[in-house]
């Protein structure tokens, strides 16, 4: 009677897909080499036949080698290709033949005894669409053909409840020796039987395991996950090839073990008496050729085709967003910038002073780089002119007096991506030239700003006025923070990073926004007309400046010195002879790390500029920073109430006096020269 086998059916846990995705994105990238995967199966006597013979792939199958209690190990490999075209064009038969040859070679050289789980091995061909979260895969369970085929030749014996109980207990002692308890010989389960179960490994057959044992008492056994009454599990096909090739048997009793310890008194195992008689006229493969192989899994309709799992329907939308946000960034590391440190950018906490045109664009771009912590500071409300220029606001935000920009911007970021930690603070930044009207409220704003600066890594100055940038500049310099600054003109902009004091305490090499000034900032909005009060700029200037500011931060964070990175230097290109900026360090994944970028939209030009720190700067000079560190609020209070305090303290007043003296000397010389000329003309 012909023998039919119950094929394996694949069963993948959902966490495995997530693990495969992360492995592809973070590690394998474009490498589609096959890698090992752990498969598991178990005898499930209570399951219906069509639900049995399940090859399970757990969530940790790519990283773990531990086999859970009651399960049997299967050796698997997975080849996760890069495109669906690669999946379709893969030579499936060659792939199956390669897996079959591994089993055949292991049988021939005897290594199968060291890794018997190869007899139930499997191969997975897969493609993970990481954008749509769909996984196309096809399992193959390679089964070698026996030539000629094995047939059932006798009515097999059946075990009694006592025999099954004794076998199950003896197997438990072998598999779990730590659970074995000392027993009274008179009470042993084997003692009531006319024989005793002795269990050996497949290797022991060649050492004479069956010597002196009647043929009817010899069983070659395997753990059978099938529950079909007459059909053994798929891996028996490979075991029968081993029996023919290694044991040289043409008749054998097979014990398909299906019992379990909990119901050991109920016989479940299937016994088969099989025979394979050699026919001289039968055309078989050569003695050393790999036998024919079959094994690609069929779908539920019985067709040889791949399966597709859509993971999106099982995933939490927030989790989908998390993975999607990081996907494009991680793809940069596959080929273009493998040394890019994305975590350095992602973990940077950003404080944005200003939630207007610059602030809304900058925040969106920061999220594009994966930044998770963004905090806004602003005291204005959304007006009807804002939504067309400020992308986080819309018409409804303008109604009833307008929503507070800081609050609404933070909410809008969370609506775009729920995984971002965005908060808003409605407050006024104390400014030079603006007198204190409520000392308690101003001090409270100062203390909150001070705490926010301390709690963040990068400070963005995105306000409308020059004087509003002074205090955050002082605080950022004192705290050693990365300070990023952008300012707009009608068709021009400046984007820059402030110099950071080195760890050795020396002066910062690069200047800040105020280092080129010879006067301290003052009230710049007093007596201004409407066109001067509003930021009148071409609509494309703000997005361009914002993008360069965020890209500059990303470049700073990739530099080994981070905020203390020097400005790039000019040198002659050896090939072209032209002056070019040097990439420092040469392997920087994003290129240059400039100090300042000045853009001119009317000419569609940008210039890279660097400027040293100024020892008389009204914001970042050592005198100002040290006074702030020592006196804190009292220093700020005095700066806001005494008109010339900052000018005198920084040394700018002395610079101005010397400039006036020099100018007077020049004027005096000019007057004398004029007299001489006049006299000459008269003569």
Curated annotation (Swiss-Prot):
Q: Which stretch carries the motif GXGXXG motif?
A: 354-359
Its primary localisation, in coarse terms, equals cytoplasm
Q: Which GO terms describe its cellular component?
A: cytoplasm; phagophore assembly site
Give the span(s) annotated as Disordered.
566-587, 663-683
Q: Name the keywords, alphabetized.
A: Autophagy, Cytoplasm, Protein transport, Transport, Ubl conjugation pathway
Q: Cite the active-site annotation.
A: 534 (glycyl thioester intermediate)
Any one GO molecular-function label of the UniProt entry = Atg12 activating enzyme activity
Q: Which domain of life is it from?
A: Eukaryota
GO biological process terms, semicolon-separated:
autophagosome assembly; cellular response to nitrogen starvation; mitophagy; piecemeal microautophagy of the nucleus; protein modification by small protein conjugation; protein transport
Where does it localize?
Answer: Cytoplasm; Preautophagosomal structure
Subunit annotation: Homodimer.
Task: Report the function annotation for this chain.
Answer: E1-like activating enzyme involved in the 2 ubiquitin-like systems required for cytoplasm to vacuole transport (Cvt) and autophagy. Activates atg12 for its conjugation with atg5 and atg8 for its conjugation with phosphatidylethanolamine. Both systems are needed for the atg8 association to Cvt vesicles and autophagosomes membranes. Autophagy is essential for maintenance of amino acid levels and protein synthesis under nitrogen starvation.
Q: Which PANTHER family match?
A: UBIQUITIN-ACTIVATING ENZYME E1 (PTHR10953), UBIQUITIN-LIKE MODIFIER-ACTIVATING ENZYME ATG7 (PTHR10953:SF3)
The free-text domain note is: The GxGxxG motif is important for the function, possibly through binding with ATP.
Q: Which family does it belong to?
A: Belongs to the ATG7 family.
Q: What is this protein called?
A: Ubiquitin-like modifier-activating enzyme atg7
What lineage does UniProt assign to this protein's organism? Answer: Eukaryota, Fungi, Dikarya, Ascomycota, Pezizomycotina
């Amino acid at each position: 009677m012909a023998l039919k086998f119950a094929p394996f059916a694949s069963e993948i846990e959902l966490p495995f897909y997530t693990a495969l995705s992360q492995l592809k994105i973070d590690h394998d990238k474009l490498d589609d080499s096959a890698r090992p995967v752990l498969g598991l199966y178990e005898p499930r006597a209570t399951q219906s036949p069509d639900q049995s013979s399940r090859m399970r792939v757990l969530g940790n199958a790519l990283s773990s080698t531990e086999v859970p209690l009651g399960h049997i190990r299967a050796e698997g490999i997975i080849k996760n290709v890069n495109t669906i075209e690669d999946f379709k064009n893969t030579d499936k038969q060659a792939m199956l033949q390669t897996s079959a040859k591994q089993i055949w070679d292991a049988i021939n050289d005897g290594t199968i005894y060291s890794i018997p789980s190869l007899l139930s091995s499997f191969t997975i061909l897969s493609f993970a669409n990481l954008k749509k979260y769909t996984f196309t895969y096809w399992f193959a369970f390679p089964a070698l053909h026996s030539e000629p085929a094995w047939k059932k030749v006798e009515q097999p014996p059946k075990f009694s409840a006592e025999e099954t109980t004794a076998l199950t207990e003896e197997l438990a002692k072998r598999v779990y020796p730590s659970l074995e308890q000392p027993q009274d010989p008179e009470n042993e389960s084997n003692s009531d039987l006319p024989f005793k179960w002795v269990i050996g490994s497949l290797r022991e057959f060649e050492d004479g395991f069956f010597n002196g044992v009647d043929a009817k008492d010899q069983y070659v056994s395997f753990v059978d996950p099938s529950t079909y009454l007459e059909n053994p599990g798929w891996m028996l096909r490979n075991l029968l090839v081993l029996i023919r090739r290694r044991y040289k048997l043409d008749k054998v009793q097979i014990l398909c073990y299906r019992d379990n310890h909990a119901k050991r008194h109920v016989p479940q195992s299937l016994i088969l008496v099989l025979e394979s008689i050699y026919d001289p006229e039968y055309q078989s493969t050569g003695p050393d050729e790999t036998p024919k192989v079959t094994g690609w899994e069929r779908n539920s309709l019985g067709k040889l085709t791949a399966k597709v799992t859509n993971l999106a329907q099982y995933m939490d939308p927030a989790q989908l967003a998390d993975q999607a946000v990081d996907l494009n960034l991680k793809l940069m590391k596959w080929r273009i910038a493998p040394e890019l440190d994305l975590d350095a950018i992602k973990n940077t906490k950003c404080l944005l002073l200003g939630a207007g045109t610059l602030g809304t664009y900058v925040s969106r771009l920061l999220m594009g780089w994966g930044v998770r912590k963004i905090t806004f500071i602003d005291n204005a409300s959304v007006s009807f002119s804002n939504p067309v220029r400020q992308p986080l606001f819309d018409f409804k935000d303008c109604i009833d007096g307008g929503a507070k920009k800081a609050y609404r911007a933070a909410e809008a970021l969370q609506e775009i991506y729920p995984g971002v930690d965005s908060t808003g603070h409605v407050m006024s930044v104390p400014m030079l030239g603006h007198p204190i009207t409520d000392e308690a409220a101003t001090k409270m704003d100062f203390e909150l700003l001070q705490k926010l600066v301390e709690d963040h890594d990068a400070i963005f100055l995105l306000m409308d006025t020059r004087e509003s940038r002074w205090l955050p500049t002082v605080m950022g310099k004192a705290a050693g923070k990365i300070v990023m600054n952008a300012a707009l003109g009608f068709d021009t902009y400046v984007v820059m990073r402030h110099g950071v004091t080195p760890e050795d305490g020396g002066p910062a090499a690069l200047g800040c926004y105020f280092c080129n000034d010879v006067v301290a900032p003052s009230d710049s909005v007093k007596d201004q007309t409407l066109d001067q009060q509003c930021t009148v700029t071409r609509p494309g200037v703000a997005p361009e400046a914002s993008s360069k500011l965020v890209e500059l931060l990303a470049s700073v964070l990739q530099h080994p010195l981070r905020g203390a990175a020097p400005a790039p230097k000019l040198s002659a290109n050896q090939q072209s002879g032209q002056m070019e900026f040097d990439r420092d360090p040469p392997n920087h994944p994003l290129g240059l790390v400039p100090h300042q970028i000045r853009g001119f939209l009317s000419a569609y030009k940008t210039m890279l500029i660097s400027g040293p720190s100024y020892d008389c700067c009204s914001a970042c000079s050592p005198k100002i920073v040290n006074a702030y560190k020592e006196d804190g609020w009292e220093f700020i209070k005095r700066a806001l109430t005494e008109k010339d305090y900052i000018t005198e303290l920084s040394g700018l007043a002395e610079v101005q006096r010397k400039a006036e003296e020099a100018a007077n000397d020049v004027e005096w010389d000019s007057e004398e020269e004029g007299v001489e000329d006049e006299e000459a003309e008269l003569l």
